[in-house]
Regions:
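Bacterial N-terminal signal peptides that target proteins for export
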Residues: 1-8, 144
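Bacterial N-terminal signal peptides
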Residues: 8-17
């Protein structure tokens, strides 16, 4: 009888240990190999309203981007898919132009820690149709837009550091897919990182994306009650 009780006790302890063990983390989904369609974008955007970007290196901190899935479904869904698969992890901000923009998203920076001939030319292997800014959207300070090169626009994006509406509209079309709503001070710190040449903007100290988390949480509520 004693041995039976001991076996029962061992089995109970094992069962409790199994129940208390942390479940294995869910592996990230595979990264996309082609641009999203409007149909596929809808499913991707169902629970994607906010992107929280954590950076390390010369600047430590995080900032959050309110995503404009309704206004720019293709660009937003593509960004969300790349963020969820871990594409941006390890990529650094390769273009820092004070008073203009900070830009990131070139996967080539994962294997380089300084300037090289193809810096700023990398992408995920595909591009997609540029979506003109929706009515009411402007290239305001802290607006977030995709690059407009047909290769780079697959993954590269930038944050405006000033009112660039007139400047960028005269230069071309850049899809606005979000706006920084939390962590503006982190953006300002990145913009202040020393660079090789103020006209080129390659940083002398790296600011690297550690992760981007996508959530359904809306941005902070403004003083007038709007979000």
């Amino acid at each position: 009888m004693t041995s039976v009780r001991r076996l029962a006790a061992v089995a109970l302890v094992a069962a409790l240990a199994a129940c208390s063990a942390d479940p294995s983390p869910t592996p990230p989904p595979p990264c996309p190999t082609e641009a999203p369609s409007l149909a596929s974008a809808q499913g991707t955007l169902e629970d994607a309203r906010l992107a929280t970007v954590t950076v390390t290196g010369a600047v430590e901190g995080e900032f959050s981007i309110e995503l404009f899935g309704d206004e720019a479904p293709l660009a937003t869904a593509n960004f969300v898919s790349l963020a969820r698969c871990g594409f941006y992890e390890g990529i650094w901000f390769h273009r820092i132009l004070a008073g203009f923009v900070i830009q990131t998203g070139d996967p080539g920076t994962k294997t380089h820690d300084r300037d090289w001939p193809d810096l700023g030319k990398g992408g995920p292997g595909y591009g997609f149709e540029i979506e003109p800014p929706a009515p009411g959207l402007r290239y305001d300070p802290y607006s977030v837009a995709m690059a407009n090169n047909q290769v780079a626009n697959g993954s590269q994006w930038f944050v405006s550091l000033a009112d660039l509406d007139e400047t960028l509209r005269s230069a071309g079309v850049y899809t606005i897919f979000g706006s920084v709503v939390e962590g503006n001070d982190v953006i300002d710190q990145i913009a202040a990182v020393p660079v090789n040449d103020p006209r080129v903007g390659v940083p002398l100290e790296l600011v690297t994306i550690a992760r981007i988390e996508i959530s359904s949480r809306p941005g902070p509520v403004a003083s007038d009650g709007s979000s």
